[in-house]
Every structure is written in C-alpha cells, then in structure tokens.
C-alpha cells in the first residue's frame, strides 16, 4: 500500500503517508483512520449519509443548497422541479474545521503540505466513526461513515480534491467525491453575462490559479469566448464572517477593501467591458453577499471607478451547481435512497473542530483558539498527535454574528441545527 500511495501522490509524500497510515489501521480506532469494512454492499452504502466539509461555517451555504435544491423529478431523475427537495430522503453530516481555519492562509506561509494533510484528514473524519464529546476525555465511535464527500470549500477543492479522489481509489471504497470549483466555473458559463469576471476568494485559492484556469477551460469547451478575468485573494474576509476576534473590523469594512482591490486588479487587465460577474470563490462569502454587493455600489460613487464596474452585477455562488452535481453522481452510482428506504441516521449531524486544550504542546491565544503563530508553523507528518478534536456542533457554539447570518440567510440549515 505504501508504494502504491507514493506513486499516486507523487507531489506530496505526506498525503501518501496519511493514506498508508489509514490503511494500516483498518478497524478505525486509531487517530486519522476509519473502518475499511463499512462499505460491504451497495444496499448498505446507499443508506449512509452524505458528508460535507469546509474549513469553518462557510460550507453551510453549500449545505443550504443541498437541503433546498428542487431541480430534478425525484421519481424519473429528469431535470425539472417537482415540488419536493431533491435530497429530502438523504441525511447529511457536516464538518467545519473551525480550529484550523482559514485554510486560504496556509499557502502564503509555505504550509501547503500541511494544508493538504488537513484536507485529507477532514475526509478521513467523515469516512470514520471517531469523534469526541464536548467534554469527553476519550473518543467515541458512533458517528456513521458516509457514501459521498462534498468538499464545500474552494481552497480545499483547489489543493485537495485530487488527493481525496486518489485516496479513495487507493482505499478501494465506493465513495463519491465532489468539489465546488468546477461547479463555480459552470455557474459562470450558465450566467451568460457579457462583461468581465472577478473572482473573490481566499489568498490560497487565488494563489492556486484554479478559478481562472477552470473558468477558461469551461468556457473554451463550450465554444465561448473568454473575457478578462481578475481575482482578489483575501486573508481577512472569511475570518471576519466567522466572527474571529483576530479580525475586529466589520464585515462591511473588509468587503469594501476587497471589492476595491478586485476593481483595481480588473483595471490592470485593460479590458474594455466593465466588471460584471463576481464569483463568490469562498463558501463563506455568500453569507456576506449583501455587504459585497453594497461595497461595489459604494465604489461606483467614485468617478474613477464608475465605468470600471457594471451597474448591475451577476453573482455566481457555486453551491447550487455543486448540489446538482451531487444529485447526478449519486443517481449514476445508484446510491440515491429509494422511495421505500431510509438513511441510517434520522437527523442531520453537525461537527466542528476545537483545540485540545489539555494536550501538551498546544499553544492557545487569549480567546482559547489556536495561537496564530503556532497554527501556521505546524509541519505535516505527525500522525499520532491530535492538537484539535472534532465535537458535535450546536447553535450556541457559533459566534454570535455568524449565528445571525446563518439564522437569517440559511433558514434550512438553521432549522436542522436546532432540532
């Protein structure tokens, strides 16, 4: 297995080591492992929930789309709404890696290998049964495994989608893996907007170049001309939306700063058409769409920027396209629940990561989160050490301003969280 893993992960030996580590502990009791015997039959697999993960609460925007999508007929599987949510019978397990967010900042400090390891660890958590209670001293093993993994994080998709797909292939398990970036590019194509394209994302996502590359490929394959594309990577906006104390200004203030930077980046393309399509290239950003849109309106009051920005912008949120892709993939693999079947869990489940405050060597900031210098100086390869633990997420654990955004803008998620 180790030789196979190294061949699959030629660019990341640490990802290969993690795949080998999980394979070496097939009972799923060890740290970063899962029960490899869980997927014994298609019938058993079909009754499993779907896993969704992000680096924090931003992926809840994707979960909202999954809970509310009505784009297919549930009986015929053909396109078209039928009045019933397309995933009404399915159940979801959501994981937000809150303790290690934002993922977009790791590449900027040369911690890409550690980021890739984190992303594969997220997948392993969803595949496994292992979790911690909020006050527990020992892990528990009653979380169900999943039949599909939705990477509801643009940075994680950019840096980890292929790693997870290769890992699933190496482990020989029938688990579907879907990411958000390709969906975002399809959203640009379907918008049919004529102006320029701006990508607002994290620093890490922008550094990867994945959106300009994927948008160009998608438009090109469809026989469409490719307009000017500019991008702006923010190290602050996702954290501000999360309510992280390290980012004390308002979400509106950070949104204005990033919108201005994107407009200036678009000016640099020297395109004749104004900036019209805004790709919300971080799953946190739909939670602040109103603030971002207002920021562009504010910028248009500046005569030097007015002609650079379209009066009416088109916002592309990759979440709905991701939900459509998951529906198609589950149907193709015959893993959608049948009309007379039920998932192995009755309700959706939510988890997030917190620092292990009792673990030797873990460094914390004054508010109890991981110390910033400690967080971004960690190295991969320590597969017997957990400085964070994954615990059930309840509404009271979400920062107040983030909870307000979820309650007001993601009603289906909020209802599920409060059951």
Task: Go through the PLM ranges and name each one.
Residues 1-6:
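Sec-dependent signal peptide recognition
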Residues 10-12:
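N-terminal signal peptide c-region/cleavage motif recognized by signal peptidases
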Residues 16-419:
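Non-catalytic structural scaffold of enzyme domains
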């Amino acid at each position: 297995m180790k030789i196979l893993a190294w061949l699959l992960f030629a660019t990341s030996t640490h990802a290969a080591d993690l795949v080998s580590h999980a394979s070496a502990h097939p009972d799923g009791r060890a740290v970063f492992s899962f029960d490899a015997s869980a997927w014994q039959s298609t019938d058993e697999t079909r009754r499993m929930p779907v896993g969704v993960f992000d680096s924090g609460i931003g992926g809840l925007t994707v979960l909202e789309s999954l809970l509310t999508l009505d784009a297919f007929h549930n009986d015929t599987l053909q396109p078209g709404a039928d009045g019933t949510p397309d995933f009404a019978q399915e159940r979801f397990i959501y994981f937000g890696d809150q303790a290690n967010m934002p993922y977009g900042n790791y590449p900027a400090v040369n911690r890409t290998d550690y980021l890739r390891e984190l992303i594969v660890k997220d997948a392993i958590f969803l595949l496994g049964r292992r979790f911690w209670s909020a006050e527990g001293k020992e892990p528990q093993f009653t979380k169900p495994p999943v039949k599909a993994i939705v990477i509801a994080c643009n940075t994680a998709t950019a840096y980890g989608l292929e790693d997870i797909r290769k890992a699933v292939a190496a482990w020989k398990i029938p688990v579907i893996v879907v990411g958000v970036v390709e969906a975002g590019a399809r959203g640009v194509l379907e918008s049919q907007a004529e102006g320029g394209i701006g990508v607002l994302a994290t620093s890490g996502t922008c550094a990867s170049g994945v959106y300009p590359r994927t948008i160009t490929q998608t438009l090109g394959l469809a026989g469409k001309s490719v307009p000017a594309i500019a991008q702006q990577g923010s190290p602050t906006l996702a954290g501000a939306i999360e309510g992280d104390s390290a980012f004390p200004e308002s979400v509106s203030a950070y949104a204005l700063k990033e919108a201005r930077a994107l407009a200036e980046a678009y000016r640099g393309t020297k395109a004749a058409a104004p900036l019209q399509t805004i790709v919300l290239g971080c799953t946190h950003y739909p939670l602040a769409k109103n603030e971002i849109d207002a920021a562009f309106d504010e910028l248009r009051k500046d005569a030097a920027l007015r002609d650079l920005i379209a009066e009416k912008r088109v916002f592309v949120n990759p979440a709905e396209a991701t939900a459509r892709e998951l529906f198609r993939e589950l149907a193709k693999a015959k893993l959608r629940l049948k009309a007379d079947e039920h998932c192995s869990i009755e309700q959706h489940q939510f988890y997030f990561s917190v620092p292990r405050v009792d673990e030797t060597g873990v460094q914390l900031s004054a508010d109890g989160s991981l110390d910033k210098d400690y967080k971004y100086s960690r190295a991969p390869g320590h597969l017997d050490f957990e400085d964070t633990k994954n615990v059930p997420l309840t509404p009271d654990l979400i920062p107040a301003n983030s909870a307000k955004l979820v309650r007001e803008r993601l009603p289906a998620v909020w209802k599920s969280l409060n059951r």
